[in-house]
């Protein structure tokens, strides 16, 4: 059971090297969940964004992949391999130093993250969106979050 969940949202300016200062809700949760001071960053299964989580969450992801493999193996065994590649092969590590990370270039490119990243807690992980993509293509709640943070950033 995960005791400390990622709950909250925030926006971060992304520098030219992909560096960003994590919002307080992410920094606080990481410090409670892991002494590793790093995040694993991978591609979201269905949305055009990234997911970030501490190394201890990998076992939860593995259990979910296995549960779904068993449930879907008669329908399409290929689904499992695609899901497993995305969950475990399309992942990179980012060190957390002084509350900052550098998004790996491959991950930034995959999610088209440019100058402003929207981070949204999803319980065991954090979704990382390009704020403009979230505004233009997200569901109603995501659109509202992105609009709020973009407006706030522009007013600053």
List the predicted regions and their residue ranges:
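Glycine-rich, aromatic-bearing surface loops/beta-hairpins
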Residues: 124-156
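Acidic (E/D-rich), amphipathic helical modules within compact regulatory domains
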Residues: 25-70
């Amino acid at each position: 059971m995960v005791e400390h969940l990622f709950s909250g949202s925030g926006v971060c300016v992304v520098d030219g090297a992909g560096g960003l200062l994590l919002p307080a809700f992410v920094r606080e949760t990481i410090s409670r969940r892991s002494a590793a001071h790093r995040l694993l960053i991978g591609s979201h299964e269905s949305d055009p964004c990234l997911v970030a989580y501490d190394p201890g969450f990998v076992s939860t992801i593995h259990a979910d992949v296995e549960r779904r493999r068993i449930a879907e193996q008669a329908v399409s065994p290929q689904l499992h391999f695609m899901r497993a590649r995305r969950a475990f092969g399309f992942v990179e590590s980012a060190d957390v130093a002084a509350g900052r990370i550098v998004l790996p270039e491959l991950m930034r490119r995959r999610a088209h993250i440019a100058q402003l990243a929207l981070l949204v807690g999803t319980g065991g992980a954090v979704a990382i969106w390009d704020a403009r993509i979230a505004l233009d293509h997200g569901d109603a709640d995501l659109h509202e979050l992105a609009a709020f943070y973009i407006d706030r950033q522009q007013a600053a």
